[in-house]
């Protein structure tokens, strides 16, 4: 069986175009995680707060970030896909975040194969309402989990997202190549 984290490339033209492996689905409370040892997607938990993922959420293959996990990516989609789905996407922004004292930033991306997102090239192209909903979700989704503390730290542009992806690719190479 293919290991979606280790066996797939980061993207067809990373960091400009990446692959996003979906774990969690838009509109749902289930927190799935890819378990590379199985390999497969497993239910990690159901979110304790009454919130749902604002869009499909997962990771970028062959990346490793400062939180010692594959680099997180939220892909703006109209309709949810499914856990394990691979979306070819373009990074357009970076959300800075601290999760229990660890840097846990999120790449925001759009699907290459959805013309509804062709006009979104950078942070300034994302509607403010969408950014507010994403920020609200990540700022509050762990509120009812004992001992968990999350702080969103603002937004950065496409270049910052691409730089962070390159950093995560380098960390993967240093730790796993």
Curated annotation (Swiss-Prot):
- Where in or outside the cell is it found? Cytoplasm
Tell me the cofactors it needs: Mg(2+)
UniProt: substrate binding residues:
31, 45, 57, 141
Pull one GO CC term from this UniProt entry.
Answer: cytoplasm
Which GO BP terms, alphabetically?
A: phosphate-containing compound metabolic process
**Annotated Mg(2+) 1 binding sites:** 67, 72, 104
Activity versus pH: the note is: Optimum pH is 8-9.
Q: Might you give the EC number(s) for this enzyme?
A: 3.6.1.1
Applied value in biotechnology: Inorganic pyrophosphatases are used in a wide variety of biotechnology applications based on the ability of these enzymes to drive reactions forward and generate an easily assayed product. Since HvPPA displays robust activity under high-salt conditions and in organic solvents, it could be a valuable tool for use in bioindustry.
Q: How does activity depend on temperature?
A: Optimum temperature is 42 degrees Celsius. Is moderately thermostable, with a half-life of thermal inactivation of 2 hours at 65 degrees Celsius, and retains 82% activity after incubation for 2 hours at 42 degrees Celsius.
Top-level enzyme category: hydrolase
Q: Which parts of the sequence bind Mg(2+) 2?
A: 72
Q: What is catalyzed by this enzyme?
A: diphosphate + H2O = 2 phosphate + H(+)
Entry keywords, A to Z: Cytoplasm, Hydrolase, Magnesium, Metal-binding
**Matching Pfam families, A to Z?**
Pyrophosphatase
Q: Which SUPFAM superfamilies match?
A: Inorganic pyrophosphatase
Q: What does the record give under GO molecular function?
A: inorganic diphosphate phosphatase activity; magnesium ion binding
Activity regulation note: Inhibited by sodium fluoride (NaF) in vitro, similarly to other class A type inorganic pyrophosphatases.
Domain of life, per UniProt, equals Archaea
How does this polypeptide assemble, per the annotation?
Homohexamer. Also forms homotrimers, but the trimeric form is 23% less active than the hexamer. In fact, likely forms a dimer of trimers.
HAMAP family given for it? Inorganic_PPase
Member of which family?
A: Belongs to the PPase family.
**According to its UniProt entry, what is the function of this protein?**
Catalyzes the hydrolysis of inorganic pyrophosphate (PPi) forming two phosphate ions. The hydrolysis of PPi by inorganic pyrophosphatase releases a considerable amount of energy that can drive unfavorable biochemical transformations to completion. Is not active on nucleoside triphosphates (ATP, TTP, GTP, or CTP) or nucleoside diphosphate (ADP).
The miscellaneous comment for this protein is: A unique feature of H.volcanii PPA (HvPPA) is its high tolerance to organic solvents, with little if any enzyme inactivation after 2 hours of incubation in buffers supplemented with 50% (vol/vol) dimethyl sulfoxide (DMSO), dimethylformamide (DMF), ethanol, or methanol. The catalytic activity of HvPPA is also found to be robust when assayed in organic solvents. Moreover, HvPPA is fully active over a wide range of salt concentrations.
Q: What is this protein called?
A: Inorganic pyrophosphatase
Name the species this protein comes from: Haloferax volcanii (strain ATCC 29605 / DSM 3757 / JCM 8879 / NBRC 14742 / NCIMB 2012 / VKM B-1768 / DS2) (Halobacterium volcanii)
- The protein's gene is named ipp
């Amino acid at each position: 069986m293919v290991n979606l984290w280790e066996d797939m490339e980061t993207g067809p033209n990373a960091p400009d175009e990446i692959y996003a492996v979906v774990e969690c689905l838009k509109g749902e409370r289930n927190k799935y995680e890819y378990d590379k040892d199985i390999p497969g997607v497993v239910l990690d938990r159901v979110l304790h707060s009454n919130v749902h993922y604002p869009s499909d959420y997962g990771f970028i293959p062959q990346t490793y970030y400062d939180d010692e996990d594959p680099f997180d990516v939220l892909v703006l989609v109209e309709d949810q896909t499914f856990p394990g789905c691979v979306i070819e996407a373009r990074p357009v922004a970076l959300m800075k975040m601290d999760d229990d004292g660890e840097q846990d930033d999120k790449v925001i991306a759009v699907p290459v194969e959805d013309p509804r997102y062709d006009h979104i090239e950078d942070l300034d192209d994302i509607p403010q309402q969408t950014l507010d909903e994403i920020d609200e979700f990540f700022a509050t989704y762990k509120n009812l989990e004992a001992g968990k503390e999350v702080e969103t730290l603002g937004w950065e542009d496409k270049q910052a997202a691409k730089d962070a992806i390159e950093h995560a690719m380098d960390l993967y190479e240093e730790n796993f190549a």
